[in-house]
Protein backbone atom coordinates (compact mmCIF):
# COMPACT_ATOMS: atom_id res chain seq x y z
CA UNK A 1 0.00 0.00 0.00
CA UNK A 2 1.55 3.33 -0.97
CA UNK A 3 2.28 5.89 1.69
CA UNK A 4 0.53 9.19 1.06
CA UNK A 5 1.39 12.57 2.41
CA UNK A 6 -0.52 15.75 1.81
CA UNK A 7 1.28 19.06 1.91
CA UNK A 8 -0.79 22.19 2.18
CA UNK A 9 -0.54 24.54 -0.78
CA UNK A 10 0.28 27.11 1.87
CA UNK A 11 3.88 25.95 1.58
CA UNK A 12 4.28 28.18 -1.47
CA UNK A 13 3.02 31.18 0.45
CA UNK A 14 5.02 30.37 3.56
CA UNK A 15 8.29 30.07 1.67
CA UNK A 16 7.81 33.49 0.14
CA UNK A 17 7.61 35.56 3.33
CA UNK A 18 11.26 36.60 3.51
CA UNK A 19 12.47 39.75 5.20
CA UNK A 20 14.55 42.01 3.01
CA UNK A 21 13.44 40.28 -0.17
CA UNK A 22 10.86 42.68 -1.62
CA UNK A 23 10.46 40.70 -4.83
CA UNK A 24 9.70 37.57 -2.85
CA UNK A 25 7.51 39.00 -0.11
CA UNK A 26 4.13 38.56 -1.79
CA UNK A 27 1.94 35.55 -1.15
CA UNK A 28 1.71 33.44 -4.28
CA UNK A 29 -1.13 30.99 -4.85
CA UNK A 30 -0.04 27.84 -6.65
CA UNK A 31 -2.51 25.69 -8.58
CA UNK A 32 -2.33 23.26 -11.53
CA UNK A 33 -2.92 26.09 -14.03
CA UNK A 34 -0.30 28.40 -12.44
CA UNK A 35 2.63 26.51 -10.92
CA UNK A 36 4.78 29.67 -10.64
CA UNK A 37 8.02 27.68 -10.69
CA UNK A 38 6.79 24.77 -8.56
CA UNK A 39 6.71 21.17 -9.77
CA UNK A 40 6.78 17.53 -8.70
CA UNK A 41 9.78 15.23 -9.09
CA UNK A 42 11.14 11.86 -7.99
CA UNK A 43 13.94 12.50 -5.48
CA UNK A 44 15.44 9.11 -4.78
CA UNK A 45 16.61 5.97 -6.56
CA UNK A 46 13.14 4.42 -6.85
CA UNK A 47 10.42 5.18 -9.36
CA UNK A 48 7.27 4.68 -7.28
CA UNK A 49 6.77 8.31 -6.28
CA UNK A 50 3.98 10.53 -7.58
CA UNK A 51 2.73 14.05 -7.00
CA UNK A 52 -0.51 15.81 -7.85
CA UNK A 53 -2.90 18.51 -6.71
CA UNK A 54 -6.04 17.28 -4.94
CA UNK A 55 -9.09 18.67 -3.17
CA UNK A 56 -8.86 18.22 0.59
CA UNK A 57 -8.42 15.94 2.37
CA UNK A 58 -10.88 17.14 4.97
CA UNK A 59 -10.68 20.93 5.29
CA UNK A 60 -7.25 22.04 4.11
CA UNK A 61 -5.75 24.86 6.22
CA UNK A 62 -5.25 27.26 3.30
CA UNK A 63 -8.05 26.99 0.79
CA UNK A 64 -9.64 23.90 -0.69
CA UNK A 65 -6.68 22.08 -2.16
CA UNK A 66 -3.33 20.59 -1.35
CA UNK A 67 -0.35 18.91 -2.98
CA UNK A 68 -0.39 15.13 -2.57
CA UNK A 69 2.93 13.28 -2.43
CA UNK A 70 2.78 9.48 -2.66
CA UNK A 71 5.55 6.89 -2.42
CA UNK A 72 5.06 3.20 -3.18
CA UNK A 73 8.24 1.78 -1.65
CA UNK A 74 11.14 2.69 0.61
CA UNK A 75 13.45 3.43 -2.34
CA UNK A 76 11.16 6.14 -3.71
CA UNK A 77 10.78 9.76 -2.75
CA UNK A 78 8.59 12.50 -4.15
CA UNK A 79 9.16 16.22 -3.79
CA UNK A 80 7.34 19.45 -4.50
CA UNK A 81 10.19 21.73 -5.57
CA UNK A 82 10.86 25.28 -6.68
CA UNK A 83 13.84 26.19 -8.85
CA UNK A 84 13.04 29.88 -9.17
CA UNK A 85 16.40 31.60 -9.64
CA UNK A 86 15.20 34.46 -7.42
CA UNK A 87 15.89 32.15 -4.47
CA UNK A 88 19.52 31.45 -5.42
CA UNK A 89 21.87 33.02 -2.90
CA UNK A 90 19.07 33.77 -0.45
CA UNK A 91 20.55 34.25 3.03
CA UNK A 92 18.73 31.86 5.34
CA UNK A 93 19.15 34.32 8.22
CA UNK A 94 16.88 36.73 6.29
CA UNK A 95 13.87 34.43 6.58
CA UNK A 96 11.69 35.59 9.47
CA UNK A 97 9.00 32.89 9.52
CA UNK A 98 8.54 29.46 8.00
CA UNK A 99 5.62 27.10 8.52
CA UNK A 100 3.69 24.54 6.53
CA UNK A 101 0.88 22.03 7.04
CA UNK A 102 0.79 18.28 6.43
CA UNK A 103 -1.77 15.49 6.48
CA UNK A 104 -0.47 11.92 6.83
CA UNK A 105 -3.15 9.33 6.16
CA UNK A 106 -3.41 6.01 7.99
CA UNK A 107 -1.69 4.18 5.10
CA UNK A 108 1.48 6.17 5.73
CA UNK A 109 4.30 5.60 8.19
CA UNK A 110 3.24 7.29 11.46
CA UNK A 111 6.79 8.62 11.92
CA UNK A 112 7.09 10.32 8.53
CA UNK A 113 5.67 13.59 7.29
CA UNK A 114 6.88 15.77 4.41
CA UNK A 115 10.11 17.56 5.22
CA UNK A 116 11.50 20.90 4.05
CA UNK A 117 14.82 20.69 2.19
CA UNK A 118 17.04 23.61 1.18
CA UNK A 119 20.11 23.18 -1.04
CA UNK A 120 22.70 25.18 0.89
CA UNK A 121 26.18 26.61 0.89
CA UNK A 122 27.83 27.69 4.18
CA UNK A 123 28.31 31.25 2.90
CA UNK A 124 27.80 33.47 -0.13
CA UNK A 125 31.52 33.47 -1.03
CA UNK A 126 31.16 30.23 -3.00
CA UNK A 127 28.34 28.90 -5.12
CA UNK A 128 28.88 25.18 -4.77
CA UNK A 129 26.27 22.69 -3.63
CA UNK A 130 27.28 21.55 -0.15
CA UNK A 131 24.29 19.45 0.78
CA UNK A 132 20.85 20.09 2.16
CA UNK A 133 19.47 21.68 5.29
CA UNK A 134 16.41 19.64 6.23
CA UNK A 135 13.52 20.28 8.61
CA UNK A 136 11.88 17.01 9.59
CA UNK A 137 8.78 17.12 11.85
CA UNK A 138 9.59 13.71 13.37
CA UNK A 139 12.56 15.20 15.24
CA UNK A 140 10.49 17.92 16.92
CA UNK A 141 8.89 15.48 19.38
CA UNK A 142 10.40 15.40 22.86
CA UNK A 143 9.26 11.80 23.43
CA UNK A 144 8.20 9.87 20.37
CA UNK A 145 6.80 11.03 17.09
CA UNK A 146 4.64 14.18 17.16
CA UNK A 147 2.96 13.16 13.90
CA UNK A 148 -0.76 12.39 14.17
CA UNK A 149 -2.35 10.51 11.28
CA UNK A 150 -5.59 11.52 9.54
CA UNK A 151 -5.55 15.16 10.60
CA UNK A 152 -3.93 18.36 9.42
CA UNK A 153 -0.92 19.55 11.43
CA UNK A 154 0.91 22.84 11.02
CA UNK A 155 4.67 22.85 11.65
CA UNK A 156 6.43 26.03 12.77
CA UNK A 157 9.90 25.23 11.49
CA UNK A 158 11.49 28.12 13.40
CA UNK A 159 9.51 27.71 16.62
CA UNK A 160 10.26 24.04 17.32
CA UNK A 161 11.89 23.83 20.75
CA UNK A 162 13.48 20.44 20.13
CA UNK A 163 15.55 19.46 17.11
CA UNK A 164 13.97 19.31 13.71
CA UNK A 165 16.82 20.69 11.55
CA UNK A 166 19.79 18.70 10.23
CA UNK A 167 22.38 18.89 7.43
CA UNK A 168 22.92 16.10 4.91
CA UNK A 169 26.65 16.85 4.48
CA UNK A 170 28.40 16.45 7.82
CA UNK A 171 31.84 17.03 6.32
CA UNK A 172 30.99 20.66 5.57
CA UNK A 173 28.44 21.04 8.40
CA UNK A 174 29.77 19.09 11.41
CA UNK A 175 26.98 20.23 13.76
CA UNK A 176 23.25 19.54 13.41
CA UNK A 177 23.43 15.98 12.10
CA UNK A 178 20.50 13.66 11.54
CA UNK A 179 21.52 11.82 14.72
CA UNK A 180 21.66 15.11 16.65
CA UNK A 181 19.27 17.62 15.00
CA UNK A 182 19.14 21.28 16.03
CA UNK A 183 16.56 23.98 16.57
CA UNK A 184 16.59 26.89 14.09
CA UNK A 185 18.30 29.08 16.71
CA UNK A 186 21.07 26.49 17.06
CA UNK A 187 21.51 26.23 13.27
CA UNK A 188 21.92 30.02 13.08
CA UNK A 189 24.35 30.03 16.02
CA UNK A 190 26.56 27.35 14.43
CA UNK A 191 26.24 28.65 10.85
CA UNK A 192 25.10 32.30 10.74
CA UNK A 193 25.67 32.84 7.00
CA UNK A 194 24.30 29.90 4.94
CA UNK A 195 22.68 30.69 1.60
CA UNK A 196 20.51 28.72 -0.79
CA UNK A 197 21.93 27.48 -4.07
Identify the residue ranges that each predicted region occupies:
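Noncatalytic modules at the cell exterior or secretory-pathway interfaces
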Residues: 192-197
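Secreted extracellular polysaccharide-interacting domains
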Residues: 70-97, 129-137
Amino acid sequence: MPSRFILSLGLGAALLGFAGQDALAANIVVDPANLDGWGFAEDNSGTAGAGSFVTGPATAPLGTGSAQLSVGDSASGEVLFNYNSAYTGLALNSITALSYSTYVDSNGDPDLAPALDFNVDPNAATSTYDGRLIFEPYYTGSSGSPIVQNQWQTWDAFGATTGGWWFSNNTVFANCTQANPCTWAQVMAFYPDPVTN
